[in-house]
Amino acid sequence: PRKQKPWADITNDLVDGKLDIAILWGPLAGYEAKKAKKPITIVPLTKEETVSRGKLVYRFTMGIRRNEPEWEKTINNLIKDNQEEINEILRGYGVPLLDNLGNPLK
């Protein structure tokens, strides 16, 4: 049968001792770790690279329509002005956050 949330199954297997280690996408790993029955340590893989996909760290991005520089400026200013609040929301969901150099944010 097809799994709807394999990351949740992986996290449960980790908590239940069926796995010693798991590699998951950071936002999903953090979210599941926050809900887990036992503490789980999240370690961002910031320096590792894979053969097929390269680096494992990348930024979230937003896209806008071309030729709308004022809208782009508005969005960029909203993000910049609200970055701490955005970070707090993401932290609330357990999302591991990194600075521009790939170092974990406190």
Where are these regions (language model features)?
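Proline/Glycine/Serine-rich low-complexity intrinsically disordered segments
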Residues: P1-K106
